[in-house]
Curated annotation (Swiss-Prot):
Source organism of this protein record: Streptococcus thermophilus (strain ATCC BAA-250 / LMG 18311)
Protein name, per record: Adenylosuccinate synthetase
UniProt entry keywords in alphabetical sequence: Cytoplasm, GTP-binding, Ligase, Magnesium, Metal-binding, Nucleotide-binding, Purine biosynthesis
Binding site for Mg(2+): D13, G40
Chain sites annotated for binding substrate: T298, T299, T300, G301, R302, P303, R304
Subcellular location: Cytoplasm
CDD domains, alphabetized: AdSS
Pfam families (alphabetical): Adenylsucc_synt
Essential cofactor(s): Mg(2+)
This protein's GO CC annotations: cytoplasm
Record lineage: Bacteria, Bacillati, Bacillota, Bacilli, Lactobacillales
EC number(s) reported in the record: 6.3.4.4
Function: Plays an important role in the de novo pathway of purine nucleotide biosynthesis. Catalyzes the first committed step in the biosynthesis of AMP from IMP.
Length: 430
C-alpha cells in the first residue's frame, strides 16, 4: 500500500498540476478528490502546454488509471469538451474512470452562482461563476443529482423537474431573472451523460483494490489549503476541502491509507479573487513578479494578486494537512531582484503572532514582519541540483525549509518537466 497526496499550500495556482504530472511517472493510479472545473492546471509535455480543468493530470500516461472521485462536482458539458480537446490533441482517455457518486453541475447551478455573486456587490467573494458552490449546496441539502442519476433517463427527468421548479421560482421571484427550460437542459445533459457513460464506475473500489494490491496511488488536490472551506480564509474560500483530509471523503479510502502528503508552493505567493492577503505587493516589484511569472488565472484569465512568500500561511497549511514533503516552485521568477523577502510572522496591534487568525477583522490589521535576504542576478532555469543554484538562491530555498519546518523534496526553476529537480523521492521509504 503506497499513496501520496499532492495539495496546494497557498491560494491555488501553486503548480500542483506540474508536480502531479511529474510524480505521476512513478504512480499507477492518479485521482482527483474535490473541486470541479473551477480548478485549472497546466502541464507542459515536450514543450507543449495542455490546460485541464477536470480530468486528472495522469491522463497523459495511457498505462495508468486516472480517477475523478466522488468528492468532485462534475459539469458534464465541460467534461465532454475537455475529452474532445484531448482527443483532438491525440491523447487517449481510455484510462479515465469517473465516480458514479460524484455530483453533477447543471445550468441552474451556474446561473445561481452568477446571480448570487452579483447580488453581493462590494461584498463579492470572487467566485469563478462555474456553479461549484451551488452544486455543493444541493449536495449538502440532499437534493443534488449524481452521475448515477444522470445516466438513468427516468430518474434524471424526475429529479431535474423537481429541482428546476424550485430554482426557477428562486430566479423569478427573488432575482427577477428569466427561468430556465426543462426540455433544453434535459435533452442536452442526458446526451452528455451517455457520452461519458463508458467511464463511469464505483471508483472507491478501484482505488482500494489498487492500494490493497500494493500499487502506487497519487491523489491530486485542486485549489489550496487557504481556500479550504474549513481551514481557509472563510468566506473567501471554495466550497470543498482541498486539505489532505479531504482525500478520505472525496475518494472513498480510509485515512490509514494515506502515507505521504506533498505540499506544493511557489517561492512567492499569489491568489485570484478577493480576500485577505497579508503579504500582497502593490508596487513595481509585484508587477514584475506578475509579468515574469505569467500570473494570470488558468480558469478565469484574471490577473493574480502577488506577494512575498508567507511562512505563516505555510505553517498553517503544514499543521492542518500533515504535510510531510514540500515542493517549491517558480524560484526562477525571483531572479534579478536585489532583495527577496520572507514573511516570518505578523504584527497584530503591536503583538507579534506566528499563527493565521480566523477573524477577517484581525487579518485586516495584520502587518507582515519580514526577513530580508540578498537576491540573485543569475538565470537559474538550467540548474538541475541545489548545488548548481547561486549561493543566494540556495540560501533562500534553505531558509524557506527552516521557517516552514518541512523538508523540501523537489524544487523547480521553470515550467518544464526537466526543470523539476528531485532532492528526495517521495515514493521512497513508504
Amino acid at each position: 500500500m503506497t499513496s501520496v497526496v499532492v495539495i496546494g499550500t497557498q491560494w491555488g495556482d501553486e503548480g500542483k498540476g506540474k508536480i502531479t504530472d511529474f510524480l505521476s511517472q512513478d504512480a499507477e493510479v492518479i485521482a482527483r478528490y474535490q473541486g470541479g472545473d473551477n480548478a485549472g492546471h497546466t502541464i507542459v509535455i515536450d514543450g507543449k502546454k495542455f490546460k485541464l480543468h477536470l480530468i486528472p493530470s495522469g491522463v497523459f500516461f495511457p498505462e495508468k488509471i486516472s480517477v475523478i472521485g466522488n468528492g468532485v462536482v462534475v459539469n458534464p458539458k465541460s467534461l465532454v469538451k475537455e475529452l474532445e480537446y484531448l482527443h483532438t490533441e491525440g491523447v487517449s482517455t481510455e484510462n479515465l474512470r469517473i465516480s458514479d457518486r460524484a455530483h453533477v453541475i447543471l445550468p441552474y447551478h451556474i446561473k445561481l452562482d452568477q446571480l448570487q455573486e452579483a447580488a453581493k456587490g462590494d461584498n463579492k467573494i470572487g467566485t469563478t461563476n462555474k456553479g461549484i458552490g451551488p452544486a455543493y449546496m444541493d449536495k449538502a441539502a440532499r437534493v443534488g443529482i449524481r452521475i448515477a442519476d444522470l445516466l438513468d433517463k427516468e430518474i434524471f427527468a424526475s429529479r431535474l423537474k423537481t429541482n428546476l421548479a424550485e430554482k426557477n421560482r428562486l430566479f423569478s421571484k427573488m432575482y427577477e431573472s428569466e427561468e430556465l427550460s426543462f426540455d433544453e437542459i434535459f435533452e442536452e445533459y442526458y446526451a452528455y451523460g451517455q457520452q461519458i457513460k463508458q467511464y463511469v464506475t464505483d471508483t472507491s473500489v478501484i482505488l482500494n483494490d489498487a492500494l490493497d494490491a500494493g500499487k502506487r496511488v497519487l491523489f491530486e488536490g485542486a485549489q489550496g489549503v487557504m481556500l479550504d472551506i474549513d481551514q481557509g480564509t472563510y468566506p473567501f474560500v471554495t466550497s470543498s476541502n482541498p486539505v489532505a483530509g479531504g482525500v478520505t471523503i472525496g475518494s472513498g479510502i480510509g485515512p490509514s491509507k494515506i502515507n505521504k502528503v506533498v505540499g506544493v508552493c511557489k517561492a512567492y505567493t499569489s491568489r485570484v479573487g478577493d480576500g485577505p492577503f497579508p503579504t500582497e505587493l502593490f508596487d513595481e516589484v509585484g508587477e514584475r513578479i506578475r509579468e515574469v511569472g505569467h500570473e494570470y488565472g488558468t480558469t478565469t484569465g484574471r490577473p493574480r494578486r502577488v506577494g512575498w512568500f508567507d511562512s505563516v500561511v505555510m505553517r498553517h497549511s503544514r499543521r492542518v494537512s500533515g504535510i510531510t514533503n514540500l515542493s517549491l516552485n517558480c524560484i526562477d521568477v525571483l531572479s534579478g531582484l536585489d532583495t527577496v523577502k520572507i514573511c516570518v510572522a505578523y504584527d497584530l496591534d503591536g503583538e507579534r503572532i506566528d499563527y493565521y487568525p480566523a477573524s477577517l477583522e484581525q487579518l485586516k490589521r495584520c502587518k507582515p514582519i519580514y526577513e530580508e535576504l540578498p537576491g540573485w542576478e543569475e538565470d537559474i532555469t538550467g540548474c538541475r541540483s541545489l548545488d548548481e543554484l547561486p549561493e543566494n538562491a540556495r540560501n533562500y530555498v534553505r531558509r524557506i525549509g527552516e521557517l516552514v519546518g518541512i523538508r523540501i523534496s523537489t524544487f523547480s526553476v521553470g515550467p518544464g518537466r526537466e526543470q523539476t529537480n528531485i532532492l528526495e523521492s517521495v515514493w521512497s521509504n513508504i
